[in-house]
Amino acid sequence: MTYFTIKSAAMSPDDDAPSPDINSLGRLMSHSEVESRGNGYEVLQQAGTVRILLSRPERGNALSLSLARDLTRLFQTFSAQHSVHRIVLTGKGKYFCSGMDLGEELYEDATERCLALQDLFGAIDACPKTTIAVINGPAFGGGVGLAFVCDIRVAVSTSFFCLSEVKLGLCPATVSRFIVREWGVSLARMAMLTARKIQPQTLHEMGVLHAVALDEEALEAVTRDVLNDLRFAAPQATAWCKVLTRKTRNANSDHDQLARQIFEAMVVAGSESEYGVAQFRLGNKNICWEQVECRHIG
C-alpha cells in the first residue's frame, strides 16, 4: 500500500508541539464508547478494530512503568483474540508520546524498567494483527520506538521525531533495534548522536512514514482510508506476512525453511486460502474476513 499526503486546511509547522483542540481518536470514534480505561490509557473497540489511546496528556503521554506493563498486557491479550484484526495506537493532547517517564525513579529499578520496555516493544513487534500508529503530535525517545515498531504509521505534519536521550547522558537502548531497522543505520545514528528533530516529511520521502496529513481532520481521513484497505486482508495471511518480513531482515538458511513451512500451511484443506480462492473464482474479490471463522491466527 502506498499513501500520499492528504491536504486539508493548511497549518504552519512550529518548532514546538501544536495544541490540537481535541485528539483525532476522540473525533474518529465519536460514535463509539470507551470500553475500558486504565492508568494512562483508554481502549475502544468497533468490529475488528481496537483503538488504544494514550491518555496522560499532562505528562506528554510518557511511558510510566505501570503504563508500559499495561500496554504490554493489552497487546498480548488482543494478539490472542480472533475477533481483533487491527490495533490503532494514538495519543491524547499535544504529544503522541514523550518517551520514558523521567519523573519516576529510574535508578533503583533500572533492570525492571528496561525489561518492561523490552517486553512492550517485543509484544507490539510480535503481534500478529496489523498495528497502526496514528501520530497526532511529537514523539520523543521511547515514543519514537512506539511509533516505528508498528506496521503502518501515519502522522500529522506538525509532528516530529526526536531521539533526545543523548542530551541527558542516556541513549535509546530499548528502541534502537527498531529505529535502525526502520530508518536505516545512517539516519538512526545521526538522529541519536545529534538529538535533532526529524521531520515527518523526511521520513515520508524515505517510505517509513506511510502518510503525512496536514492537520487533524486530514489525519482522521487517512486513518479511515488505511482501515478501509485493511478490511480485506485475511488474518492468517496477515500474521504470516509479518513473520516473513521480520525474518527476512535477518535472512539466513532458516528463512527458506520458514517460507516452505508457511507455504505448505497456507495451501492445505480448510485453510484461509482455500476459502479465499474459492470466493475469487466465484467473482468475490473483496472478502469480509471478519465474518469468516478462522482455524488459527498467530
Curated annotation (Swiss-Prot):
**Do the record's keywords include Lyase?**
yes
Is Lyase one of the keywords?
yes
Keywords assigned by UniProt?
Answer: Lyase, Virulence
User: Which GO molecular function annotations are given, in alphabetical order?
Assistant: lyase activity
EC code(s) of this entry = 4.2.1.-
Pathway membership, UniProt:
Mycotoxin biosynthesis
Taxonomy, superkingdom: Eukaryota
Give the phenotype of cells or organisms lacking this gene. Answer: Leads to drastic reduction of ACT-toxin production and disease severity after inoculation on detached leaves.
Q: Which CDD domains match?
A: crotonase-like
Per UniProt, the enzyme's principal EC class comes to lyase
The record's annotation in InterPro entries points to: ClpP/crotonase-like_dom_sf, Enoyl-CoA_hydra/iso, Enoyl-CoA_Hydratase/Isomerase
As for what it does, the entry says:
Enoyl-CoA hydratase; part of the gene clusters that mediate the biosynthesis of the host-selective toxins (HSTs) ACT-toxins responsible for brown spot of tangerine disease by the tangerine pathotype which affects tangerines and mandarins. ACT-toxins consist of three moieties, 9,10-epoxy-8-hydroxy-9-methyl-decatrienoic acid (EDA), valine and a polyketide. ACT-toxin I is toxic to both citrus and pear; toxin II the 5''-deoxy derivative of ACT-toxin I, is highly toxic to pear and slightly toxic to citrus.
Q: What is this protein called?
A: Enoyl-CoA hydratase ACTT6
Question: What species is given as this protein's source?
Answer: Alternaria alternata
Which gene is this protein's source? ACTT6
